[in-house]
Amino acid sequence: MAQYLSTLLLLLATLAVALAWSPKEEDRIIPGGIYNADLNDEWVQRALHFAISEYNKATKDDYYRRPLRVLRARQQTVGGVNYFFDVEVGRTICTKSQPNLDTCAFHEQPELQKKQLCSFEIYEVPWENRRSLVKSRCQES
């Protein structure tokens, strides 16, 4: 009986250690699954910059827009990488013809800010140096 209890306690201790060391459910990366992207990651930053650049090319506004804040960033590894961004963008005081648009200040007057909530989907195949904007949807916020 004592040997049975010892074996049972050893199994329970092993299980407890395994569960403590296993990653949390939200940290697990499932192949093909969508998970939160690290905004400090260089590839994520490149994808976001690409989305904003394509967005600015498509707008008829003379003024450059850039992210006010990123609400959510996710990614999915498939035959490349899908990036999904939910971003609040704002209108800057810089026209699109000016250099170094990333440092442009935002309009301070509310009627000129023209904030928008945008969702972008980017598909990238890094080893082929290929990137495309799959979806782009924006609405006034």
From Swiss-Prot:
GO cellular component, one term: extracellular space
A GO molecular-function descriptor: cysteine-type endopeptidase inhibitor activity
One Pfam entry name: Cystatin
Subcellular location: Secreted
Motif position, Secondary area of contact: 76-80
Name of the featured protein: Cystatin-SN
Classification via CDD domains: CY
InterPro entries, sorted: Cystatin_dom, Cystatin_sf, Prot_inh_cystat_CS
Site (Reactive site): 32
Tissue and organ expression note: Expressed in submandibular and sublingual saliva but not in parotid saliva (at protein level). Expressed in saliva, tears, urine and seminal fluid.
